[in-house]
Amino acid sequence: MVGEAANGQDAIRVANENCPDVAVLDYGMPLLNGIGAAREIMRVCPRAKVILLTMHTDDHYVLEALRTGIKGFVVKSQAPADLMRAIHEVLGGMVYLSPRVSRTLVQAYLTKSALPADPLTPREREVLQLVAESKTTKEVAKLLGISAKTVESHRTRIMKKLDTPNTAGLVRSAIRLGLTQV
């Protein structure tokens, strides 16, 4: 183990400093969730393979992770032995899904569920997560290294895309999309 992180931004910093073979990320990390952190870690350290540790098993979470390039998806309730298996599989060049997740994906495939495309850009998802975590516009701007005006522009586009008129609706959407937890 080369490092530990308290949030998504710390995880990126640790990965940038150490470029690990495998990064195990919690989906529900504060500041930047596991998916957002994974995107950035894979950008700064292309050889790193990411395993997502989560309690979510709905097909849209799994598909979002796979589209991002995550190589392992481990359900927390199945963790210790499952995580070790995932690390070995991923290091061997395979993709690993917890058995519970595999069943969910097969069921979704068999019922031919139409999964809607994500309407938000990665940056909009970051802004939405931080807004849902009760960050002010100034705090979001500082954390993301952008202006407050840009944050407001993102927020306006997010509200339009998600068809919600207020912050409460944004928080509900963030929970539904798995960007934050209650």
Please place each PLM-identified region on the residue numbering.
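Active-site residues of response regulator receiver
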Residues: 26, 54
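Helix-turn-helix DNA-binding segment
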Residues: 107, 114-150
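Active-site beta3 strand of CheY-like receiver
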Residues: 18-24
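Acidic catalytic/metal-coordinating carboxylates
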Residues: 7-10, 31-36
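Short hydrophobic/Thr-rich beta-strand motif most characteristic of the beta2 strand and flanking loop
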Residues: 1-6, 14, 164
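Short amphipathic alpha-helix used as the core "switch/output" element in two-component signaling
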Residues: 13, 35-47
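Short, flexible helix-to-coil linker/hinge segments that flank and couple to helix-turn-helix
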Residues: 60-126, 179-181
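Basic, Lys/Arg-enriched C-terminal extension of HTH/homeodomain DNA-binding domains
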Residues: 159-182
